[in-house]
A protein has these predicted regions:
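Hydrophobic, helix-rich cores of sensory/ligand-binding and other regulatory modules
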Residues: 2-115
Length: 115
């Protein structure tokens, strides 16, 4: 399982490289780490969908339609073939999609080496 320590460590390092907010959600769709500390502990509806569904990426142009969601891009975090969480980058989807893909790759790589 994705743990808070790893998620917080990732946010601290990766957050330095982008102006955009990054959120990491656990398997229940709860934000466990974020550049925006006020969001930690909140349920994220789209994260829950992507963790328990089969979508590879979800663009959210209007976050207000969903519980705990702001505009951005959401991707699943996968570890050894299982979805264990989600990572999202807040912003206009066309602007943050590539950043979100890099963040997904980075956290999955970190997760693999640290677990």
């Amino acid at each position: 399982l994705l743990d808070n320590f790893l998620a917080e460590k990732f946010i601290k390092k990766a957050g330095e490289s982008t102006e955009y907010n990054i959120n990491i959600m656990d398997e229940k769709g709860v934000i466990i780490a974020s550049k925006d500390a006020e969001r930690i502990g909140n349920f994220h509806e789209v994260a829950y969908w992507i963790i328990h569904g089969d979508e590879e990426i979800i663009d959210v142009p209007d976050g207000g339609k969903y519980l705990g969601v702001k505009p951005g891009v959401m991707l699943p975090i996968e570890h050894r073939g299982k979805r264990t969480g989600a990572i999202g980058v807040t912003g206009e989807p066309d602007e943050v999609r590539d950043i979100a893909k890099v963040m997904k790759f980075a956290i999955e790589t970190m997760y693999e080496f640290e677990s």
